[in-house]
Amino acid sequence: MKILVTGHKGYIGSHLFSDLKRLGYNVRGIDIKDGEDILHCLPNEDFDYVFHFAAQPRVEFSVHHPSYTMKQNVLVTSTLLEWAKNHSVKRVIFSSSSAVSGDGDGVPRSPYGLHKLISEMECRLFSELYGLDTVCLRYFNAYSEDQGFGGSYSTA
């Protein structure tokens, strides 16, 4: 079984990547540098599973830079889904966010939340149109001992 982890150097992706390696899985990680096109990072080989964590992660940053965040989150996810469809990936596991839920009414309150919701919808669309198996996980208050506590949107 071959596994690809996007955003494998990020907060949650790095933990999963390390655990999969430790457990002996055939895993490869990619990380997108600022402004880099994901197509240049994606390997020209097939994988069974893709865990997609690559994103511009901060709500506060998205409020100040909505179009940049849109490109980094929505366009990257769209490109990855198309790549997965063309490389016979069995399942894409998409890392979404509690920011999609807004204040509990399902209406995002930030560009970051909106972009994650759009990406969830695109995952569903790829499942319906192309038969690509996708799963979206919404994380609430992810925390570890090495987490930073800064920012006005910190909740844990």
Task: Specify the residue positions occupied by each region the protein language model found.
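N-terminal Rossmann-like NAD(P)+-binding domain of SDR-like oxidoreductases, especially those catalyzing
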Residues: 1-145
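Short, intrinsically disordered, charge-balanced linker/junction segments flanking boundaries
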Residues: 25, 152-156
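ATP-dependent carboxylate-amine ligase catalytic core
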Residues: 149
